[in-house]
Amino acid sequence: MTVLYLLEPESPGGEWAPFAGVRPIAELRAGIWRIRERWEAAAGVDVKVTWGSHAAGFSEGDEPPLRSLEPLDGPALVGASWFAPTGVPISPGHGVRRLVHRDETVGWVVPEGERWSGPHEKGPALEIDGLRLRGTFDLLTALDHLLSDDCADFLAAPGDPVPQGSLVLGDPANLVCLGATVEPGVVFDVRNGAVVVDQGSEIRNGSRLEGPAYVGPGTRVLGGFIRGSVFGPECRVRGEISSSVFFGFANKSHEGFIGHSVVGHWVNLGAGTTTSNLKNTYGQVRLEVDGERIETGRLNVGTLFGDHAKTAIGTMLPTGTVVSAGANVFGSVTPPKYIPPFAWGCTGGERMTEDGFLRIAERVMTRRAVAFSPERREALRRTFQRTIAR
């Protein structure tokens, strides 16, 4: 049986901020699904190992082990974690040694009896469909290209009837509720794409959801206008949210605009936090990451929030801001476009201590009934030490 592996970028740079060194690229969401899950769907098997050392020690409990690259024996398939397959089954024929997308190698086929020692450009290739990701900002591009089809894939699932008292604009068949609680007065606009409300989620009165959109298990939409966005598990959201992806366990329980943004795990956004997602010049957005300038090629980029980042009440974030892992954004000044890992405030260069970060993380996770196990503590401790040293 063919074994599936994923290969991380050897040394991801600023283009993958604020997640380089924090979590594997394979565990980021491209559309509804994590990149790893997309490879698993395309290959028809689960990933055995993710090869990569930049996020050594990462652990959340449901991901494959993360190890340094070493030779492997076939039969195997190795996928690049910077590529998101569309889910079309991959069936390499006899003699195929590489998977390519627009002339770029994004995977390798290792037949039985052969050994693979690392990336190469040798042998016949099979063209596959998907999206090449240049950095974290291209998770927004994934929403543009993948979300509509991701939501449409749910249409065949046996869902609940249209919730009583809700208003559906468009064909009700494009609303999929899978064991969710929906209060009367919710508006679902499915004229431009399906809306999927997954198991155990809750949509409260005063919410309007415009498809394509996905609300993950256990997530609560507390009110406001949601369009073109993805929410992973156990998020709390309110206000206006447009073309954004929330990985999971994030908290935005108050008013404020979040547009064209990526929100990592365990992020907490204070009341009124607002992102700018468009320059006054209507020019392409450039990121600034620790002195490095990165061209996104995109007109709309809001803020990229790293895991465990937090903002104070009324925080106003410029277009193309990067808030690194564990950073606490507060103060009377406009935040800079780059906020380093575990920053304490926007000025003065102060940083959180390791003990302080772990103490807050334990409080936050306990409130969501997530066990702060010794293994999780150790994983976060290693993340702190690794990112501070970068």
Feature-to-residue mapping (PLM):
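Terminal amphipathic alpha-helical/low-complexity segments used for targeting or macromolecular assembly
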Residues: M1-A173, S332-K337, P341-R390
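Active-site-proximal helix/loop capping residues that flank conserved catalytic or ligand/cofactor
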Residues: R34-E37, F137, L178, P217, ...
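Glycine-rich hexapeptide-repeat left-handed beta-helix
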Residues: P12, E27, G223-F225, G232-R390
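Extended beta-solenoid/beta-helix repeat architectures
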Residues: P158-G264, K279-N280, V289, L304, ...
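Generic, low-specificity signal for short hydrophobic/alpha-helical stretches with a mild N-terminal bias
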Residues: P18-G21, E121-A125, V162, E183, ...
